[in-house]
UniProtKB/Swiss-Prot annotation:
InterPro entries: DNA_methylase_N4/N6, DNA_methylase_N6_adenine_CS, RAMA, RM_Methyltransferase, SAM-dependent_MTases_sf. One of its GO terms (molecular function) is DNA binding. Its EC number is 2.1.1.72. The keyword NADP does not apply. The keyword Transferase applies. One of its GO terms (cellular component) is cytoplasm. GO terms for biological process: DNA replication; methylation. It comes from Brucella abortus (strain S19). CcrM-mediated methylation has important cellular functions. Contributes to the accurate cell-cycle control of DNA replication and cellular morphology. It catalyses: a 2'-deoxyadenosine in DNA + S-adenosyl-L-methionine = an N(6)-methyl-2'-deoxyadenosine in DNA + S-adenosyl-L-homocysteine + H(+). Keywords: DNA replication, DNA-binding, Methyltransferase, S-adenosyl-L-methionine, Transferase. This is DNA methyltransferase CcrM. Residues 280-382 form the RAMA domain.
């Protein structure tokens, strides 16, 4: 897929009640919809987003003020939107927004939900009950977590992310395995991620120097999520948009976004933040892919492109075995005909063989694998947008 330049609207904010039910894409794409998440999600069409990142209320169950040893008060989450009458009320709320998210998620889409020990297990239960299929749980290990000032529990140094596909048979979801492995020094990316909490210049502050949002997530966390599970041009939905981290990272990484938020101060902060983001260029956004993600090329395509002619003699890299290319795209050797893979296996006495890497052609006295010709075909397909 060719990268595209995304044009973002001058005004990001849309009012949920002014959008029609299942509004056209142009009415909500790259926008912040102001309103309750469930009612706002009704404005989006079925199967319209590729990835969802949700940072729902944690239902922290705080039993009073929390103080440091010097008696200064800890800034914790005590906003009205994080307060529920009971676990049953929280479960009903969770089920409602997850159902709404499931409707707008594409069949091959995935959802990420982040939470603490206060809520993530209840969210996980609802995800499974609604038919989502859990792919991974990711542990975000914080390099600079808040201490446990009362000394009555272990220091809470992580949060948990659940990554799930829309349904068990939801094949074709995006996972950029090779890119994640390459970014991790060619070692498989593990499910424990080490990031600092959001501090310093990245932390949004109001005119009084106070935090704009109590649970602002680090951009590095969202960047890894998007680089792992989406492609440039994909639509990322955040139903609890807050200070706009998802939108800012999506814009920088060439993804579309749609955020839902009901609190005007958060909307104002997110709008200013996103408008200040400069998207990366096409070259920087190219995602590394592996063999499985590359388009299939038939050996006959190499011949049809004139890169090999009937009668060409192929051999292995040590010139031990030889085969002749036939006009129908098969090879013949030792009186037997078949595909490049079958004949490669037969001449070696093996059960299987990758003919693309086994067979070589000669060019200017140098042997080259026919896989180099397949690469030329794939480059032509990419240039044509195939």
């Amino acid at each position: 897929m060719r990268s595209q330049v995304i044009e973002y609207p001058m005004s990001l904010v849309r009012l949920a009640h002014e959008l029609p039910i299942e509004a056209p894409r142009t009415a909500w794409l790259d926008s912040i919809i102001k309103g309750d998440c469930v009612s706002a999600l009704e404005r989006l069409p079925d199967h319209s987003v590729d990835v969802i990142f949700a940072d729902p209320p944690y239902n922290l169950q705080l039993g009073g003020d929390l103080h440091r040893p010097d008696q200064s008060m800890v800034s914790a989450v005590d906003d009205h939107w994080d307060q529920f009458e009971s676990f049953q009320a929280y479960d009903a709320f969770t089920r409602a927004w997850l159902l709404a998210c499931r409707r707008v998620l594409k069949p091959n889409g995935t959802i990420w939900v982040i939470g603490s020990y206060h809520n993530i297990f209840r969210v996980g239960t609802q995800l499974q009950d609604l038919g989502f299929w859990l792919l991974n749980d990711i542990v975000w290990r914080k390099t600079n977590p808040m201490p446990n000032f009362r000394g009555r529990r272990f220091q809470n140094a992580h949060e948990t992310l659940i990554w799930a596909s829309r349904e068990q048979k939801g094949k074709g979801y995006t996972f950029n395995y090779e890119a994640m492995k390459a970014a991790n020094d060619d070692v498989q990316m593990r499910s424990d991620w080490l990031f600092p909490i959001c501090t310093g210049s990245e932390r949004l502050k109001d005119e009084n120097g106070d935090k704009v949002h109590p649970t602002q997530k680090p951009e590095a966390l969202l960047a890894r999520i998007m680089m792992a599970s989406s492609k440039p041009g994909d639509v990322i939905l955040d139903p609890f948009f807050g200070s706009g981290t998802t939108g800012a990272v999506a814009k920088r990484l060439g993804r579309h976004f749609v955020g839902i938020e009901r609190e005007q101060p958060y909307i104002d902060a997110a709008t200013a933040r996103i408008n200040a983001v400069e998207p990366l260029g096409k070259a920087e956004l190219t995602v590394m892919t592996g063999k499985r993600a590359e388009p299939r090329v038939a050996f006959t395509s190499v011949m049809e492109a004139g890169l090999l002619r009937p009668g060409t003699v192929l051999c292995d890299e040590r010139r031990r075995f030889a085969a002749i290319v036939r006009a129908d795209g098969t090879l013949t050797a030792n009186g037997e005909a078949g595909s490049i893979h079958r004949i490669g296996a037969r001449v070696q006495g093996f059960d299987a063989c990758n003919g693309w890497t086994f067979w070589h052609f000669e060019e200017n006295g140098v042997l080259k694998p026919i896989d180099a010709l397949r690469k030329i075909i794939r480059e032509q397909m990419a240039a044509a947008g195939a």
